[in-house]
UniProtKB/Swiss-Prot annotation:
Keywords: DNA-binding, Metal-binding, Repeat, Zinc, Zinc-finger. Residues 225-235 have a biased composition (Polar residues). This is Zinc finger CCCH domain-containing protein 49. InterPro entries: Unkempt-like, Znf_CCCH. One of its GO terms (biological process) is regulation of DNA-templated transcription. One of its GO terms (cellular component) is plasma membrane. Residues 209-235 are annotated as: Disordered. GO terms for molecular function: DNA binding; DNA-binding transcription factor activity; zinc ion binding. It holds the Pfam family zf-CCCH_AtC3H23. A zinc finger (C3H1-type) spans 120-146, 155-177. PROSITE patterns: ZF_C3H1. Transmembrane segments: none annotated. The keyword DNA-binding applies.
Amino acid sequence: MMIGETRRTYPTVEIPPWPVLEELTTSEFFSPVMNSPDCSMLEALAGLQRYLPSNEPDPESYPDLLGPDSPIDAYSCDHFRMYDFKVRRCARGRSHDWTECPYAHPGEKARRRDPRKYHYSGTACPDFRKGGCKKGDSCEFAHGVFECWLHPARYRTQPCKDGGNCLRKICFFAHSPDQLRFLHTRSPDRVDSFDVSSPIRARAFQLSISPVSGSPPMSPRADSESSPMTQSLSRSLGSCSINDVVPSFRNLQFNSVKSFPRNNPLFGFGSPRGSILGPGFQSLPTTPTRPGNLDIWEYGLEEEPVMERVVESGRELREKMREKLHKENCMDRVAQDPDQNLGEAPDVGWVSDLLM
């Protein structure tokens, strides 16, 4: 104790401060309208803010939101990935991790050229792989992995092999049918253009990730789904309409069926039980078929010249068949009916009718 200081009989009591969440502003405490309805409403709102749930999603409750394509990430949209990712220069002044930044930095290997400004394809440049390209930014090929796979002609045009289990920060492939991109070569005002929400997108995604089998478990419908043949035609024909191609294609195949011989193994497809048009136009047969898709264009082009040669050489073929049957009868290889006349010649008229 200091000299002259009185002894205190009671200890000092420390009063804790008010919590910040429960404090109101000073103007509200000393306001002359403290007991007004507006003041009581502010007090009620201040008390409810601690118990009301937040509008922002909880990443712990929804682990899918933490993925590379989560809606929380503003840089995961297709437009930003194709045209702005590692293209736009970074505006940060301080040092930071370049791999975590979506923008381009001086001297960075992942830097991309703007595909809207520089006209280059999605094919990798062979000279750049060897060590350096002399053309530089004027090269018509892609320099690096990011320019190759983030190019608008290749980005998310193929499904990801990992699907929903992909953990890559930047994935160049599609993880769902909605993410699969189709390259539109036709004008947007056409009525028969592909719809983003149509079943063709989901069907194409399933066909691209599923192995090729002999017969599918169920017959696809022509009005709701597209066959692989129709999809290949749509990609090869470009701006031509599928609705215009199908009628002409049917007429072509109908004429080809007429010219097929009855001993052809494909003749059963032209019967009422099946059709040579394939699974995209009617139901598939229930009997097992050979694996793989039937390339009708290729088969038709191969068979027609053979049939022409057969028709041209029909007389020679008939003579050979008559000679062969005559030799077999002479060598007693053909079993004869006891009631049949031995001098009667075999009936080969059906061969002539077949080849006429």
